[in-house]
Amino acid sequence: MSKPTREEAKEAVRTLLKFIGEDPSREGLLKTPDRVINSYAEIFSGYGKDVAEILNTKFYETCNFRDFILLNIKFTSFCEHHILPFNGTVDIAYVPDNCIVGISKLARIVNIFARRLQIQEKMTVQIAESVQENLKPLGVAVKISAVHSCMSMRGVMQDNSVMNTMHYTGIFAEQQKYRHEFLNLTAKR
């Protein structure tokens, strides 16, 4: 698949404006195609970014703690089904084996995956598996809680529904006590 030119993308926006009954040549919409293309470039900037590159700065120190947890990483993504936003928080825990990363690195990988067309279930797995693959900890737990505009703006019109997804690797997948502790910590916010 070849990438369309900027002008082709702008023409697609004009076509969508016509489809909804708008006149793309009216004053308020003249610059809308450019604005949409610029917004999409930022919103979907997660494509082509390498998580391994983000997580390659590791600290190989003796870990004097049993596990690591970062709560409440805020994100906004767009569902691949309706291209409508969903937003919420990500909680990440891992039990280091011999290395850790700076906490901003975890927020950065959330942003990489959130800035793509997504489904929440897949994003949860992608975050957990990327931490597992790159840091090789004893285990990883990821929980995402999000509100989906495709549920609140259309269809069933449920604006208070929160979807929770979890994915576990290593000792979090194998031992219930680790999962239980993680879920207790994430519920106490």
Swiss-Prot record:
Signal peptide: none annotated. SUPFAM superfamilies: Tetrahydrobiopterin biosynthesis enzymes-like. The keyword Zinc applies. Gene3D superfamilies: 1.10.286.10, 3.30.1130.10. Pathway: Cofactor biosynthesis; 7,8-dihydroneopterin triphosphate biosynthesis; 7,8-dihydroneopterin triphosphate from GTP: step 1/1. Its EC number is 3.5.4.16. One of its GO terms (cellular component) is cytoplasm. Keywords: GTP-binding, Hydrolase, Metal-binding, Nucleotide-binding, One-carbon metabolism, Zinc. It catalyses: GTP + H2O = 7,8-dihydroneopterin 3'-triphosphate + formate + H(+). The keyword GTP-binding applies. Pfam families: GTP_cyclohydroI. One of its GO terms (molecular function) is GTP cyclohydrolase I activity. Belongs to the GTP cyclohydrolase I family. This is GTP cyclohydrolase 1. It comes from Rickettsia rickettsii (strain Sheila Smith).
